């Protein structure tokens, strides 16, 4: 029995270590929210999940060290819902950042960003007047456009050099006018009309060389924030997927070890417990994978139906809470 308790304790220790990248991802998003992304939403669920995994793992370690069956059971019970929440949250992040990206521009290395290329819940949140008032102020106060200026040995950057810079989505959308407006480059944040506008882009009239205004009220700036959010969320989601896979494997092994500990407490034959150990791991792992797979497929199909019949915000809410309930 002691060896199985040690196994559960070891798994809890590795689970504790896995909470570090989740918590780190939340802290990284929080730092981004205070600089360029400026949307304070996604980081808090990640931070809460990371802290929850840490606390639950410590409880599991204590249960394994003192052979406390209740703490072992509490670890398995709560960890199931934490894993389900992390899976649902990761899927939610992918769904809301599914659409939209920058457009390639001829003779430019950077991309231009257009709000019409984005849709769904995240776009509605960013473009909401109440939210954008705070987001726009955050982008301006972050000084991202002040930092865009460059010079080479004291010589200001030329237009040709600027056109072949790899600008971030926020720099491209908020710090310069859209390319199709036909403005002429003076420096990185000063542009003058250089010809007729190409296409009816309302952002052309919103551009202002006042460094406090620039294009912070342009649709391209909102699209740039969306593009930056998509990149940040996708990076963290990749880490979450890897962590989830490892967590599920650890969870299944811990379940099998806990079942054997229960058998020991119930005075069941040791040999029988050992013989069924591998079979139990295989069947439990298969059962959980099948449940998660069919749950995801069903809820994705249901979410697609909701998008067709209802608005995106309602559909995403149903998807997220429906997945956690199913799990």
UniProtKB/Swiss-Prot annotation:
Keywords: Glycoprotein, Membrane, Transmembrane, Transmembrane helix
Stretches in topological domain Extracellular: 28-43, 97-235, 309-327
Pfam families on file: Tetraspanin
GO cellular component, one term: membrane
Keyword Glycoprotein: yes
InterPro entries: TET_plant, Tetraspanin/Peripherin
Compartments in which it is found: Membrane
Side Cytoplasmic, residues: 1-6, 65-75, 257-287
UniProt record, GO biological process: auxin-activated signaling pathway
Segments crossing the lipid bilayer: 7-27, 44-64, 76-96, 236-256, 288-308
Residues carrying a glycan: 34, 187
Family: Belongs to the tetraspanin (TM4SF) family.
UniProt xrefs under PANTHER family: TETRASPANIN-8-RELATED
Function: May be involved in the regulation of cell differentiation.
This protein's name: Tetraspanin-4
Organism: Arabidopsis thaliana
């Amino acid at each position: 029995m002691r060896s199985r308790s040690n196994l559960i304790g070891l798994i809890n220790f590795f689970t504790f270590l896995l909470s570090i990248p989740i918590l780190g991802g939340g802290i990284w998003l929080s730092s981004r929210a205070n600089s360029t992304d400026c949307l304070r939403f996604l980081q808090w669920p990640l931070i809460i999940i990371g802290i929850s995994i840490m606390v639950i793992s410590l409880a599991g370690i204590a249960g394994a060290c003192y052979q406390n069956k209740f703490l072992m059971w509490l670890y398995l019970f709560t960890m199931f819902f934490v894993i389900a929440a992390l899976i649902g949250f990761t899927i939610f992040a992918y769904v809301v950042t599914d659409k939209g990206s920058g457009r390639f521009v001829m003779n430019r290395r950077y991309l231009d960003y257009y709000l019409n290329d984005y849709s769904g819940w995240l776009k509605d949140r960013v473009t909401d007047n109440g939210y954008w008032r705070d987001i726009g102020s955050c982008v301006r106060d972050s000084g991202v456009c002040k930092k865009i200026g460059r010079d080479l040995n004291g010589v200001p950057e030329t237009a040709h050099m600027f056109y072949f810079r790899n600008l971030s989505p926020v720099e491209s959308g908020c710090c310069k006018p859209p390319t199709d407006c036909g403005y002429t480059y003076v420096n990185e944040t000063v542009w003058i009309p250089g010809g007729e506008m190409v296409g009816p882009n309302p952002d052309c009239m919103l551009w202002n060389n006042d460094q406090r205004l620039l294009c912070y009220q342009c649709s391209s700036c909102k699209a740039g924030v969306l593009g930056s959010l998509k990149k940040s969320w996708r990076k963290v989601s990749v880490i979450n997927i890897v962590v989830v896979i490892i967590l599920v494997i650890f969870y299944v092994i811990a379940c099998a070890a806990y079942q054997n500990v229960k058998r020991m407490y119930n005075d069941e034959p040791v040999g029988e417990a050992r013989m069924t150990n591998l079979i139990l791991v295989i069947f439990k792992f298969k059962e959980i994978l099948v449940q998660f797979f069919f749950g995801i497929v069903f809820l994705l199909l249901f979410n697609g139906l909701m998008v067709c019949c209802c608005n995106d915000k309602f559909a995403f809410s149903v998807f997220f809470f429906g997945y956690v309930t199913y799990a």
